[in-house]
Amino acid sequence: MAPVQLDNHQLIPPGGGGGSSGGGGSSSGSASAPAPPPPAAAVAAAAAAAASPGYRLSTLIEFLLHRAYSELMVLTDLLPRKSDVERKIEIVQFASRTRQLFVRLLALVKWANDAGKVEKCAMISSFLDQQAILFVDTADRLASLARDALVHARLPSFAIPYAIDVLTTGSYPRLPTCIRDKIIPPDPITKIEKQATLHQLNQILRHRLVTTDLPPQLANLTVANGRVKFRVEGEFEATLTVMGDDPEVPWRLLKLEILVEDKETGDGRALVHSMQIDFIHQLVQSRLFADEKPLQDMYNCLHCFCLSLQLEVLHSQTLMLIRERWGDLVQVERYHAGKSLSLSVWNQQVLGRKTGTASVHKVTIKIDENDVSKPLQIFHDPPLPASDSKLVERAMKIDHLSIEKLLIDSVHARAHQRLQELKAILRSFNANESSSIETALPALIVPILEPCGNSECLHIFVDLHSGMFQLMLYGLDPATLEDMEKSLNDDMKRIIPWIQQLKFWLGQQRCKQSIKHLPTITTETLQLANYSTHPIGSLSKNKLFIKLTRLPQYYIVVEMLEVPNKPTQLSYNYYFMSVSTADREDSPVMALLLQQFKDNIQDLMSYTKTGKQTRTGTKHKLSDDPCPIDSKKAKRSGEMCAFNKVLAHFVAMCDTNMPFVGLRLELSNLEIPHQGVQVEGDGFNHAIRLLKIPPCKGISEETQKALDRSLLDCTFRLQGRNNRTWVAELVFANCPLNGTSTREQGPSRHVYLTYENLLSEPVGGRKVVEMFLNDWSSIARLYECVLEFARSLPEIPAHLNIFSEVRVYNYRKLILCYGTTKGSSISIQWNSIHQKFHIALGTVGPNSGCSNCHNTILHQLQEMFNKTPNVVQLLQVLFDTQAPLNAINKLPTVPMLGLTQRTNTAYQCFSILPQSSTHIRLAFRNMYCIDIYCRSRGVVAIRDGAYSLFDNSKLVEGFYPAPGLKTFLNMFVDSNQDARRRSVNEDDNPPSPIGGDMMDSLISQLQPPQQQPFPKQPGTSGAYPLTSPPTSYHSTVNQSPSMMHTQSPGNLHAASSPSGALRAPSPASFVPTPPPSSHGISIGPGASFASPHGTLDPSSPYTMVSPSGRAGNWPGSPQVSGPSPATRLPGMSPANPSLHSPVPDVSHSPRAGTSSQTMPTNMPPPRKLPQRSWAASIPTILTHSALNILLLPSPTPGLVPGLAGSYLCSPLERFLGSVIMRRHLQRIIQQETLQLINSNEPGVIMFKTDALKCRVALSPKTNQTLQLKVTPENAGQWKPDELQVLEKFFETRVAGPPFKANTLIAFTKLLGAPTHILRDCVHIMKLELFPDQATQLKWNVQFCLTIPPSAPPIAPPGTPAVVLKSKMLFFLQLTQKTSVPPQEPVSIIVPIIYDMASGTTQQADIPRQQNSSVAAPMMVSNILKRFAEMNPPRQGECTIFAAVRDLMANLTLPPGGRP
């Protein structure tokens, strides 16, 4: 049995027991079931071939599986018909058989691991047995030889001399000669003998060649090395020699090589098989032995064979050519092997050009039967013409054995013949034609329009495959070329009309190419509504319409005509045509004017210089050649001959001049005097100068005259390559303002106005003139303001002169830089579209990139300036508002979450709502409103904006009064101000709810204007007074008793907030202020600030002096001794409510301008005054430094830095936040289980719990914090320090920044807790307030009054974090004290629940987020549980503080672990 091969190519030799085990297995089968094959049947089936090297293990396994499967299928068919016991027996027997087979296979595989070693041992044993047999057989044969054949044999005498020679000398000199000659080769001949022999053999060969009849084809021979080599190029190479010098000795053919090659289809392989060469070798050798002329016979034999082989090669090349490239263009007419090959090309019937009898061009290659020694002969039918001997000679040879080259040479010659015929036709039409034929690629180059470049010539090719004409002309569409080819192939004489047609087409192409760099659109046809009746219809049909894209209503028409007796030349006529404007895009236009250009081009230029139109003149006649060249030169000397310089000049001239003509017409239509179109720069540029510009509306006659006097020149020019950009140059002299820019230092100023013409509008149309007049109006409007500003400069106050400077004035824009460092800028220019001044703000220098503080009131500044365009007044407003706005812009305006009980609603801390240029309203959390009025001399007036401006008993809808605002603002009043105030008692007890200044404002607003703004004083040369005349107190007050009892409605001057980004509730009585009148510049009510809400500010210090000449006393007004305050602070009359603010003692008021932004802690509280609900509506005067302190974020005064929170805010925010927290507290007390106690003290809230009495009020020292005063019902239960901790915690952590209502709710719930629980909470608060006192603890604690974002998700972040029912739930934040400096300290949120019934303190079991760590909560819970087990609670004792303290002392997180 052959071995078995495993998957890894290991052979398993079949081994013992297979057959016997198989037999045993088969005998155990049941009689009812078919006998299974023996277990080794699979192996036996494969072992039939004994020569097989082995069997694959996979094959054996596959056989076994098939057998098991077949037996199983048999069982499934037979078992259902048997009883249960028989079925079980059959199943057991099947399982046993199958198991036994696979066990045997397993044993075979295990045995196969050592089969290789066994096989090697068997092979060695077999080899040794064979060797033993050989030895035994040799011994038997020798014994038989000795006993039978050599019985009488005797040995010779011992060769002792030979033995002595061998043993002594090592040689055998006495070796017999017969043996020596058999085994020892003779010595080789020497090199000299070899050369002599070969030289002698060469002489013998030369003698034999001379004396032998040698064919002339074998003349190419070489004799060397005793051989002669005959070489016939392209056929064969034979090497011969002779075996002796006898002339009768025959030639010997040593080597034969066939030189026939097929370089195109042979793929480098030999064409003759080696067996064929051997046969030919034997055949030639036999001829050399027997023939009388052996060499002639050898040549004839090999030559015939090579010609037949060449013919076969050409035939195979033809078949491949037909199959791969030429197809039906070449056909095999006849092929006789070894005789001839006939091919046909240019078969018109095959090509489908003609039917019936048609000329067929044949090429025949055959062997000359008469003279076999000749090479292959080539015949052409019909015969080739003798026009070009070189082409014919090439077509009659087949040197390289290439059928394709032979065909190409043949058709090349025939193509040259066809081109000669076509050239003859052209010469019959034009005797002077100059076409040429190129022989490299058969082509006829025909010039169409002289002079003609190579790219403009018509190239006529002959397709070498089909013999058809193929045409090429650059730029001509393929469809026309196809028509020309079809017509020319049908009849060659049809080329003449096509040449005539192409001549006009080429003329059009030359015109298009000549003007393609110019703004034009060319077309051969133009849809005109009046084409038949207009003179344009009488022109030649060969014409070109050139549309000027910048002048869409004008065309240049080029007419092309024949030149008599000159078939290759054209004459051009040029016309100028104007058309009407189309109603729709698809509607045809009408031709209006058609005139021919003048005869002389220079006349056209003279017309332009004199201002006449260029579309008049007579017919323009040109020479036949637009680009004449010397006839001696080559006619196609360059492509510039195709450039029509006359047409290009006409187009460029019209494109340049017509816009000026259009502009001149528009200026004339508008009656604007000008000098017409003028030529500048030696004819390189054109311009139109205006003599006078019409006056502008809304400009005074004086300003108009001054502007006309300063204007020196106004010139219009075209700029840019597209001639669509107009530049108007204005030259001014005597500029009223000189900026700091170096460009504005000369005696004259140049202003350039640029206008872009749209593509849909004609260049130089009315639109350009209208835009210029609008710009001129803008210049005049701004010039009027600048002129007035220049007149006021000599008398401008010194502070304004230092505050501002003129940076740029270019007649279109005025840019002023202002501020202490001149880092802010304001730009003023007139907007002709909106017909008003436009103001832009910015920053320059080191401040560039920052925001201008006046951007807040930009809209109000713009409206004010448009109402009263006075630059001095604008600068005064900027001066008065810069410092307040810088302070206001520091207020936080970002919306915040969690400020109220609706934690998801964002509230804006401060909303800045500018009402006018000097009136800014601040809304705090959409509840409280503060009005800030910017006044001169560095002061502002502040009032409670919740009160109506006209009736202090009425409130603005949406706002609430801020209690204590007047007292809080008085803390920032500077006692050293020039204007003296009234007493504090009179401030809080004014004589009337309506202030005197408010009356003045209302009276002045209701009265008609009686004086112009900035009245000119005699003797000041038109300058405006910058200081108001001193007036007495009585002259500044108007008597109007009827106004005392008249209340204006609150919504008389309703307005909405101009601040769109900071949208807040917009009360109906937001009243903007009028423009300021600084330093006594009186402004009449008619010229008041025209804001979008236009009304007068009741507390503005800029109210004008009453025009009434009557003097009287205001009823109930106190008399003020000394000079009138109006002489020092304009607008501050004694009746002005700004003087009603209380003035504390000098030592009690912070001084303005001090470096400290916090109030002194030792300042005594202000004097207690009788409260008036509308006292805060009376403005309080503050300096800019005091306002900066009021609005600048600073630490909370009166608090230790450690106790103050990290949230910095301004004193105003702290005051309003404290007021709003007090308001929240009052509402919370009504909702919670607290009892409110009535209090007579204003601004004080008193309430009590079961064990405590609480008093909440603003800090009397600063009014910036809300303080809690706690008084226990049972003094023995509380220690003083515990009460102080509770009060400090309320002041710093509950009612402090950021002033959240939910912290109050949580704190009031703590106050309502039982005393023992509250005391433990107070101890925790003490650890938070004074963390340094607990140095032995590892953690700092923070009592969370609202749920932090990182807490377990039990409620939304920001909601109250204290729940007090049968159990108490609160949150603590623990922060690790020791931490690595680069890392943030580890903080964890611990929810703690205290069971009042059992007294246990545990961590609340709240599900954590999936991504949060559970290590820290588990450790916290374990520590609290261990504390509860170790310290069981006592009756009436709270364990909160003890458990928390133990947690802070024992909690240790694993290294590197974070919660």
From Swiss-Prot:
Residues 1029-1059, 1097-1106, 1152-1161 have a biased composition (Polar residues). The gene is Med14. It comes from Mus musculus. Residues 1-37, 979-1171 are annotated as: Disordered. Keywords: Activator, Nucleus, Phosphoprotein, Repeat, Transcription, Transcription regulation. A motif (LXXLL motif 2) lies at residues 1187-1191. One of its GO terms (molecular function) is transcription coactivator activity. This is Mediator of RNA polymerase II transcription subunit 14. Component of the Mediator complex, a coactivator involved in the regulated transcription of nearly all RNA polymerase II-dependent genes. Mediator functions as a bridge to convey information from gene-specific regulatory proteins to the basal RNA polymerase II transcription machinery. Mediator is recruited to promoters by direct interactions with regulatory proteins and serves as a scaffold for the assembly of a functional preinitiation complex with RNA polymerase II and the general transcription factors. GO terms for cellular component: core mediator complex; mediator complex; nucleoplasm; nucleus. A motif (LXXLL motif 1) lies at residues 75-79. The modification Phosphoserine is found at S623, S992, S1117, S1124, S1133, S1141, S1149. GO terms for biological process: positive regulation of transcription by RNA polymerase II; positive regulation of transcription elongation by RNA polymerase II; positive regulation of transcription initiation by RNA polymerase II; RNA polymerase II preinitiation complex assembly; somatic stem cell population maintenance. It is found in: Nucleus. Component of the Mediator complex, which is composed of MED1, MED4, MED6, MED7, MED8, MED9, MED10, MED11, MED12, MED13, MED13L, MED14, MED15, MED16, MED17, MED18, MED19, MED20, MED21, MED22, MED23, MED24, MED25, MED26, MED27, MED29, MED30, MED31, CCNC, CDK8 and CDC2L6/CDK11. The MED12, MED13, CCNC and CDK8 subunits form a distinct module termed the CDK8 module. Mediator containing the CDK8 module is less active than Mediator lacking this module in supporting transcriptional activation. Residues 14-27 have a biased composition (Gly residues). Residues 194-572 are annotated as: Interaction with STAT2. Belongs to the Mediator complex subunit 14 family. Residues 506-830 are annotated as: Interaction with SREBF1. InterPro entries: Med14_C, Med14_N, Med14_RM2, Med14_RM6, Med14_RM8, Mediator_Med14, RM3_Med14, RM5_Med14.
